[in-house]
Amino acid sequence: MSLIVKICGLSEPETLEAALEAGADMVGLVFFPPSPRNVDLARAAELAARARGRAEIAALTVDADARLLDAIAREVRPDWLQLHGNEPPEAVAALRETYDARVMKAVALATRADLAKVAPYVSVADRILFDARAPKDATRPGGLGVPFDWRILEGADPGLPFVLSGGLHADNLSEALALVRPHGVDVSSGVERTIGVKDADMIRAFIRAARAASSSPRPVDGESPAFQRSEKAG
């Protein structure tokens, strides 16, 4: 299976269209008011309607309550819930059972020891997203444009398909993919001219770079122990 490319934090129809036309596999919508990429439900529903059938839709939340999650499920109908907070494994399992969406759990990395945080989620999530650990004074857990040491993931077996995130952009993607063999890559700030404002040319450049850097086949879910599929039926 080819590398999955996800453009996250989209908030305008024009840049969403740029991502879709350039061949993005997934698009992410952020539901977290402290983020400059936050979208309200009405805008999210509009964007999701444009993307549906052309790319998978991920709804990014941070320790969201049931009211918000219910509204997202009803109005946006995402394919994925992308959880970037401190959601414990039992909460992730409950969300996976409650909503008609697969679950991607973000895990922040700073050292190789942080990989131990993945194990409790292997049986309750469908995919892991590795991001850089946010600074202590950060107001949001991701989208900060900060990479982590990709060598942390060299030879790692997280037990689930995983997405590489954190500080990626068109100019460093080939270096990252030379060290790590992810199921997919995720970018947000790396395709922005200013914080929270996506740039269509940068989106296209990132997707081109991802395709060029991933010319060899990617692992398929279930192909090996490191990529065991744990997806909700249906």
Swiss-Prot record:
Q: Which GO terms describe its biological process?
A: L-tryptophan biosynthetic process
What InterPro entries does its record include? Aldolase_TIM, PRAI_dom, RibuloseP-bd_barrel, TrpF_fam
Q: What is its EC number?
A: 5.3.1.24
Pathway listed for it is: Amino-acid biosynthesis; L-tryptophan biosynthesis; L-tryptophan from chorismate: step 3/5
Q: Name one Pfam family in it.
A: PRAI
Gene3D superfamilies named in the record: Aldolase class I
Regions that span the bilayer: none
Q: Where is the region Disordered? A: 211-234
| SUPFAM superfamilies attached to this UniProt entry | Ribulose-phoshate binding barrel (SSF51366)
Q: Which reaction does it catalyse?
A: N-(5-phospho-beta-D-ribosyl)anthranilate = 1-(2-carboxyphenylamino)-1-deoxy-D-ribulose 5-phosphate
Keywords assigned = Amino-acid biosynthesis, Aromatic amino acid biosynthesis, Isomerase, Tryptophan biosynthesis
| UniProt GO molecular function | phosphoribosylanthranilate isomerase activity
Describe the family membership recorded for this protein in Swiss-Prot or TrEMBL. Answer: Belongs to the TrpF family.
**PANTHER family with a match to the protein in the record:** N-(5'-PHOSPHORIBOSYL)ANTHRANILATE ISOMERASE
Name of the protein in its database record: N-(5'-phosphoribosyl)anthranilate isomerase
Q: Which organism is it from?
A: Afipia carboxidovorans (strain ATCC 49405 / DSM 1227 / KCTC 32145 / OM5)
* The organism's taxonomic lineage, starting at the top: Bacteria, Pseudomonadati, Pseudomonadota, Alphaproteobacteria, Hyphomicrobiales
